[in-house]
Amino acid sequence: MSGSSGPLSWPGPRPCALLFLLLLGPSSVLAISFHLPVNSRKCLREEIHKDLLVTGAYEITDQSGGAGGLRTHLKITDSAGHILYAKEDATKGKFAFTTEDYDMFEVCFESKGTGRIPDQLVILDMKHGVEAKNYEEIAKVEKLKPLEVELRRLEDLSESIVNDFAYMKKREEEMRDTNESTNTRVLYFSIFSMLCLIGLATWQVFYLRRFFKAKKLIE
């Protein structure tokens, strides 16, 4: 960046790098691993837009050697409690579903067993949106060249970025409307409170005036 007081400049290939970072920025991938103690429940939550494909793979490493009847249950639900995927005695597998609304989704692992059993290692890899699409399969079906596949991916990614910005703009408008509505209600309440205080003060003046006249303290 130049030290002069003129407009900001980006020397070298920074615009390309910035565009590349923007395209890679909203990566919709959740890859996580954690230990799950016996007779415990751990949940992960994520907000996902509507009409998006969500895919995932999980693997649960059982270090108990089958002791204590250890079993792990997997359940994926939305904020309304609707079950999108469920698997009892889960060990390793994949899941996929399409969201119907913008919502908070919850992935829960629950371990059940008896005795002293080592913690299980849970590995979860969840993708949605562009990252969930299988472009290799799309290339085979539509007979696309590698460059065409990459252009398709960039097109989908650009559309995803535009949708994210559109959603953020919508949320900003909703929050602004809520803020304006709140300010209006506060203004009306302030005016009402002021009128009540003025009315109460006026009533007190007349009441005290009559009281003092009755006591003949004033004429």
Swiss-Prot record:
Glycans are attached at residue 179. GO terms for cellular component: COPI-coated vesicle; endoplasmic reticulum membrane; endoplasmic reticulum-Golgi intermediate compartment; endoplasmic reticulum-Golgi intermediate compartment membrane; gamma-secretase complex; Golgi membrane; melanosome; plasma membrane. Residues 32-185 are lumenal. Residues 204-219 are annotated as: Interaction with COPG1. Keywords: Cell membrane, Cytoplasmic vesicle, Endoplasmic reticulum, ER-Golgi transport, Glycoprotein, Golgi apparatus, Membrane, Methylation, Protein transport, Signal, Transmembrane, Transmembrane helix, Transport. SMART domains: EMP24_GP25L (SM01190). Pfam families: EMP24_GP25L. GO terms for biological process: COPI-coated vesicle budding; cytosol to ERGIC protein transport; Golgi organization; intracellular protein transport; positive regulation of interleukin-1 production; positive regulation of protein secretion; protein localization to ERGIC; regulated exocytosis. The modification Dimethylated arginine is found at residues 171, 176. A motif (COPI vesicle coat-binding) lies at residues 211-219. A motif (COPII vesicle coat-binding) lies at residues 211-212. Ectopic expression of TMED10 alone does not result in its proper cis-Golgi network localization. Interaction of TMED10 with TMED2 is both necessary and sufficient for transport of the couple to the cis-Golgi network, and TMED3 and/or TMED9 contribute to facilitating the process. This is Transmembrane emp24 domain-containing protein 10. It comes from Mesocricetus auratus. The lineage of its organism: Eukaryota, Metazoa, Chordata, Craniata, Vertebrata.
